[in-house]
Amino acid sequence: LDDDADAEEILKKVEEGLDELSLFTNLGARTITSGETEDKDWINNWKQYFKPFTVDHILIKPTWETVPEEHKDKLLVQIDPGTAFGTGMHETTQLCIRQIRKYTTPETTILDVGCGSGILGMLALKFGAKYSVGTDLDPCAIEATYENMEVNGISKEMYEVMIGNIIDDKDVQDKVGYGKYDIVVANILADVLVALTPVIVDQLKDGGIYITSGIIDDKEETVVEAVKAAGLEVLEVTYQGEWVSVTARKNG
């Protein structure tokens, strides 16, 4: 923060934001601490920890790194998340990647709820999907997705991104559209998935696939129950470390 920043006012806004978020998930004790620390380039400092890595036959690398010689035969995805979420390194993202790969066809239209950097929609297009739509609450997701799609050679005619809360914003729901998606993917917190699932059923085509993650293992049954309660058939539950992905189908 700048020297003249009003820390108390900022903390108040943080509390207000947490109040809003608590409508969708349990935030625990919500303890907030503040203090002074050394001034560093925090926006870019994290980049030293983001190195090229593989997910099965896919090489995911930051835009500022070169392709390792031993991985030049892999499907290449380049990512610069900026301030949006999504490098692909987290177990939940990798769980979603594998399920998207499994269910994507050349006719697939995919909706990515909470798209962040755009990595999941981008990979669906790399796997051969026809069109991708992403939604996010963070305005940074638009710029990050457009930049990442461009650096990966994906045409603007193949995707779109919109900002808004699809759970309770009818305008966003209408803009996204109903009954038009072969796949809906949501890599979000489990408690948000519980609220999202009954809404997202309307966006899926009959026979469409719903891929979820962001689920810690002790929340697995909560999400499975929400998926079943929405009338979806659970097809698979997959695991990586302590994280879970639930994949279901809308039968019509």
Label the model's feature ranges.
Residues 1, 79, 246-250:
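Short beta-strand element of the conserved SAM-dependent methyltransferase core
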Residues 1-70:
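N-terminal auxiliary segments of SAM/dcSAM-dependent transferases
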Residues 31-33, 59, 131, 158-160, ...:
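Conserved beta-strand segments of alpha/beta enzyme cores
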Residues 61-62, 134, 212:
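Hydrophobic residues in well-ordered beta-strands that form the structural core
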Residues 73-81:
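A short, charged helix-loop
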Residues 83-166:
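Conserved SAM/SAH cofactor-binding pocket of Class I
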Residues 137-251:
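S-adenosylmethionine
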